[in-house]
Every structure is written in structure tokens, then in C-alpha cells.
Regions:
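Structural motif
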Residues: 7-8, 100
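Conserved phosphate-binding/catalytic region of the ribokinase-like
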Residues: 30-34, 82-200
Length: 200
């Protein structure tokens, strides 16, 4: 019922490390795709959770094959594609199935590519206290912004403002301690974007 009611089904590779969670997660994602839900995948690679890098790469590729929206870090881009080049790496990932690829770059911002646009969006200057949860804030803000976006605009449109919104969410999260308690409100993100600085 939860999958039937959702607009976006999001998962990561932590749930792909072992059975039976692996099969359950992949089956759920495949079912969501059959129901025409948007599928979002964030590898969130944690080396200590995997027996080998090759095993991690194999399972991550299974997740990517199901995804419409893919978010990776710079390190994951290199792991999966063999290149750290944003242009080349994002093109390789697009060929694997996703129609929107996002690469988070820490203090440099985020790069996105869909079928017609590719752009690096700078982030907001902050005094970082704890970066825990910044990536999750970025993904959450992205998916919140994309959940009602028409498919044509999602995969063909200019998403620079949406990525900027997500960058602001990630930057603000880094200015506070903890993970969930550090997540900013929509109002705080909007103020951050208006001031063009991540310190409120």
C-alpha cells in the first residue's frame, strides 16, 4: 500500500549489502517502477559494509539500472564509472538507465545532468560544524522539489533552481550538530537563498 501511494520510491545500497534485505529492496523498487513511480537511488557507499569493492559495484549497478533519478558523490562517481570527470562520468551513468544524474561535490556544490542540460551549481558559503546529514538533506530537498514536477520538465528542463534549493538545504545542515536535528525548514532554506549565504 505504501508503494502504491508514493510518488517517488527512494532507496540506497546499504539495503543491498546482504540477503534477504537485498532481494526485498530490489523487488520493491521493481514493483514501484511497474506502478509508474519515479525511482530514486543514492548508493551511499560504505566500504566497511561490503566484502569487496567489486561486490559493492555489482549491487550498486543493479540499483542504478532501476533508477530514474540517481545521486552520487564524487567518490562514488569514480568507483562506478572509473572517471572523476563530471561530464564524462555523468554521461556514462545516464547510459545505464537514469534520466537525471546528480553528483554532490561538497563545498563546490553539485553537478546535474538530464537529457538536455548539464551544469555545475555552486553551493552556499558556510562555517561547517558537522557535515553529517548534509547529503541526506540535499537528497530530501531535491526529491521534495521533484515530486510533483511533470516528467517532461524533470528530464528535459532546466533544474538549476531546484539543485540550488537542495544545495542550500545541504549547506544549512552542515552548520549544525547532529543529523536529523540539523535539517533546515523550507523557510530557512528560502531565507538562505535570498541572502546568498548559509549562515542565518
Amino acid at each position: 500500500d505504501l508503494i502504491d501511494q508514493c510518488k517517488i520510491f527512494h532507496f540506497g545500497s546499504v539495503s543491498l549489502t546482504d540477503e534477504p534485505c537485498r532481494s526485498a529492496c530490489l523487488d520493491a523498487a521493481a514493483y514501484a517502477k511497474q506502478q509508474a513511480k519515479r525511482i530514486s537511488f543514492d548508493p551511499n557507499y560504505r566500504p566497511l559494509l561490503w566484502d569487496t569493492e567489486a561486490d559493492a559495484r555489482e549491487q550498486i549497478m543493479r540499483g542504478i539500472a532501476l533508477a530514474d533519478i540517481l545521486k552520487v558523490s564524487e567518490e562514488e562517481l569514480l568507483l562506478i564509472t572509473g572517471t572523476a570527470d563530471l561530464e564524462a562520468g555523468s554521461k556514462i551513468l545516464m547510459e545505464k538507465g537514469p534520466s537525471l544524474v546528480l553528483v554532490t561535490l561538497g563545498e563546490r556544490g553539485a553537478f546535474y545532468r538530464n537529457r538536455t542540460h548539464a551544469q555545475l551549481i555552486p553551493t552556499y558559503p558556510v562555517k561547517a560544524i558537522d557535515t553529517t546529514g548534509s547529503g541526506d538533506a540535499f537528497v530530501g530537498a531535491m526529491l521534495w522539489s521533484l515530486k510533483d514536477l511533470p516528467e517532461e520538465e524533470l528530464f528535459l528542463g532546466d533544474l538549476s533552481q531546484i539543485v540550488d534549493f537542495a544545495n542550500a538545504a545541504g549547506s544549512l545542515t552542515a552548520t549544525r550538530g547532529g543529523a536529523i536535528p540539523a535539517l533546515p525548514s523550507i523557510e530557512e532554506i528560502q531565507v538562505c537563498r535570498q541572502k546568498k549565504i548559509g549562515i542565518l
